[in-house]
Regions:
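Short amphipathic alpha-helix with an adjacent loop that forms part of the alpha/beta core around
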Residues: 37-43
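A general marker of short, structured functional hotspots
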Residues: 3-5, 40, 158
């Protein structure tokens, strides 16, 4: 029984974080998109599942899979436009974990800031008035500017360290 890395992505952020994590996994560890997940997921002790945050939780494709995971160890990693150390980031992992059939199977979670699709920014600015939580403001513009460079090399290094520490914890 081994480990598999699954990821759902929209802009490529989560895919690139998954690939960084895969580079420190034991040789032969599968790393595939959620839509290509093998039917025999129960054959794996540990599932690393990556998703992009949508409305404060895992995106729909990943959420559907999370609801079915009964593996012994589940590890989440997520990308979002907000800062990785924000309350929103932490709460996104918590909300995704609430979807698990067995909440005790969640080992840990990692969050990385990622660039935001410009179409999403445009849509948000049209939907929400300036100054509102999701509307245009100097703070929101600064957040989007900061997100443009992520994930970056430091994020990938952090993702690799996270993956190594989780594997060590599970083996120890």
């Amino acid at each position: 029984m081994g480990t598999i890395i699954l990821y759902s992505y929209l802009t490529g952020n989560t895919k690139s974080v998954a690939e960084a994590m895969a580079s420190v996994m034991p040789e032969g560890t599968p790393c595939v998109p959620v839509k290509e997940a093998p039917a025999n997921l129960g054959d794996y002790d540990t599932v690393f599942l990556g998703f992009w945050v949508d409305r404060g939780t895992a995106n729909k494709e990943a959420a559907k899979l999370i609801e079915t995971l009964t593996n012994k160890h589940i590890v989440f990693f997520a990308t979002l436009g907000m800062y990785a150390d924000s309350d929103h980031a932490r709460e996104s992992i918590e909300k995704a974990s609430a979807l698990l059939p067995n909440k005790e199977s969640l080992v840990d979670g990692f969050v990385c800031q990622g660039k935001i699709d410009p179409k999403v920014i445009e849509m948000m600015y049209k939907m929400f008035p300036p100054g509102s939580a999701h509307g245009q403001s100097p703070e929101r513009d600064a957040l989007h500017k900061a997100a443009e460079t992520h994930p970056d090399e430091q994020d990938f290094a952090n993702a690799k360290e996270f993956a190594k520490s989780v594997l060590a914890k599970l083996q120890g």
